[in-house]
Amino acid sequence: MFSKSVTLAQYDPDLAAAIAQEDRRQQDHVELIASENYVSCAVMEAQGSQLTNKYAEGYPAKRYYGGCEYVDIVEQLAIDRVKELFGAAYANVQPHSGSQANQAVYASVLKPGDTILGMSLAHGGHLTHGASVNISGKLYNAVTYGLDENEVLDYAEVERLALEHKPKMIVAGASAYALQIDWAKFREIADKVGAYLFVDMAHYAGLVAGGEYPNPVPFCDFVTTTTHKTLRGPRGGVILCRDNTHEKALNSSIFPSLQGGPLMHVIAAKAVAFKEALQPEFKQYAKQVKINAAVMAEELVKRGLRIVSGRTESHVFLVDLQPMKITGKAAEAALGKAHITVNKNAIPNDPEKPFVTSGIRIGSAAMTTRGFNETDARVLSNLVADVLANPEDEANLAKVRGQVTALCDKYPVYGN
């Protein structure tokens, strides 16, 4: 029998100490990694619940195990809420990650060797959109499109490649593209060649939910998203469709093809996050995310930095560091010393290796969750610029670190 009175700190002080240190880091550092965010205490409570004890292979009312009457309620809540959130007719909330959701979409209608057309990883796409190092680039014949000379998504190239290669599926969505994507244009191109249209909106889902980014669901055969990032939920994935045409194929692609039992505690946490995203205040959050990102990009331009694509229309943008003679790896390290967390990121036509890069990626989702407004975003962008101007000056880094501490103390991640 387990005792509820025994704490983690009592049972495993080493692990508890590491968690406490990470908690302190999150409080003391400004998080600007575009794929990260903070979840609510309610989300964490659901994910840490007794639901982790329950195996539930199958789907609500169609399980391979007994005792699933209550987890059925949990999963159905998540399904109903995410369908309402994005206007979808079909939803599968069981994918353990966005990558597995994407794999399931491919497996539902494609055969090995079929051609897919996706955004190049080097131009802002994602590994799972056909990159050669990913299973999607090994199982399928992946053709890639990219950005034009103005660093805008090249729809003419997408159409040209689609007409030339006749892909069975066109993949839209990105992990490092700042501008809005024209889903209707992608639908038009897909229809010209009889291709399925699949959108991975993992980075933009929270903005879509908040009405600050176009909703791809009405235009697509398949839509996937992660449930963290801008959506502010637990780490996991979701598949959505505008109708139920592919319901059977998608469900079987997840279970039993790619996964076994669903993570019911995570699905419960997803349900909480979906409820939060349905509230009016989430729309204000999404609006502020876009405002903060735009302000930061504009302020960095004023400080002489170059923003890929020239601006942002979302939560994310890339900074080209080549004019400053500093790599993304070095910039990430210097900013980290100042308690500003970013990730190094390749820019279009990057001459550096992927583990070095010539750029950094900046996102505003997590800082906005803390309560940062446009005034704070302006201050923060100047602190970033200060570090990049003198990345090896320890006195400069210490000065910036002190200013970051003041900002973080003003906006605690979790209040009382």
Curated annotation (Swiss-Prot):
SS bonds (residue pairs): none
Record keywords: Amino-acid biosynthesis, Cytoplasm, One-carbon metabolism, Pyridoxal phosphate, Transferase
Cofactor(s) of this protein: pyridoxal 5'-phosphate
Catalytic activity: (6R)-5,10-methylene-5,6,7,8-tetrahydrofolate + glycine + H2O = (6S)-5,6,7,8-tetrahydrofolate + L-serine
Pfam families per the UniProt record, alphabetical: SHMT
EC number(s) per entry: 2.1.2.1
Record's function text: Catalyzes the reversible interconversion of serine and glycine with tetrahydrofolate (THF) serving as the one-carbon carrier. This reaction serves as the major source of one-carbon groups required for the biosynthesis of purines, thymidylate, methionine, and other important biomolecules. Also exhibits THF-independent aldolase activity toward beta-hydroxyamino acids, producing glycine and aldehydes, via a retro-aldol mechanism.
Quaternary state and interactors: Homodimer.
HAMAP family to which the protein is assigned, alphabetical: SHMT
Protein name per UniProt: Serine hydroxymethyltransferase
Annotated organism of origin: Neisseria gonorrhoeae (strain NCCP11945)
Gene: glyA
